[in-house]
């Protein structure tokens, strides 16, 4: 929606994701990512509820999606020891495209996140809730 910008900046010698509010330039912390550095390839959902990024845990690179509403961080399992290189989160957070390396080859994989995350809908978009029946 243009309200948020996710950037990678050098903080203490490590690439770190920062979330900036565009209206005033303030930086909003993302505590879920603080233990898993360095960071790369940040991507935001429509309203900025979900922040996807690639993090490092030991020698392993992980693709994660952080839900800023409830504070949960969801690591995305990649089969066969593939390493994420870049990612792009769909605006509604229902899919993510991942560029991965697999035994020296580059691949792009599309993961369905609809069982993991609820949609991040644009402002004003109504939910498709069925009408209540007047009969018991």
List where the protein language model places each region.
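Post-signal-peptide N-terminal segment of Sec-exported extracytoplasmic proteins
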Residues: 1-31, 36-37
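Extracytoplasmic electrostatic interaction patches
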Residues: 74-85, 90, 94-95, 103, ...
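Conserved positions at the start
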Residues: 14, 38-41, 83-86
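Beta-strand C-termini and the immediately following turn/loop, strongest in propeller blades
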Residues: 7-12, 52-58, 97-103
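Blade-terminus and WD-like Trp-Asp/Gly-His loop motifs, strongest in beta-propeller folds
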Residues: 1-4, 41-50, 87-95, 132-135
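Glycine-centered loop/turn positions within well-structured domains
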Residues: 3, 15, 25, 49, ...
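Structural motif
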Residues: 14-18, 59-64, 104-111
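Multi-bladed beta-propeller domains
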Residues: 22-38, 55, 67-83, 113-136
């Amino acid at each position: 929606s243009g309200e948020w910008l996710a950037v990678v900046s050098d903080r203490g010698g490590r690439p770190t994701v920062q979330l900036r509010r565009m209206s005033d330039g303030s930086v909003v912390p993302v505590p879920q990512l603080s233990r898993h550095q360095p960071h790369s390839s940040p991507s935001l959902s429509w309203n900025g509820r979900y922040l996807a990024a690639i993090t490092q845990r030991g020698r392993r690179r992980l693709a994660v999606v952080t839900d800023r509403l409830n504070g949960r961080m969801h690591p995305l399992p990649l089969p066969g020891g593939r390493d994420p290189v870049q990612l792009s989160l769909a605006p509604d957070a229902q899919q993510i495209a991942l560029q991965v390396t697999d035994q020296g080859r580059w691949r792009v994989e599309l993961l369905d996140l609809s069982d993991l995350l609820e949609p991040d809908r644009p402002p004003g978009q109504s939910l498709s809730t069925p009408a209540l029946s007047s009969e018991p």
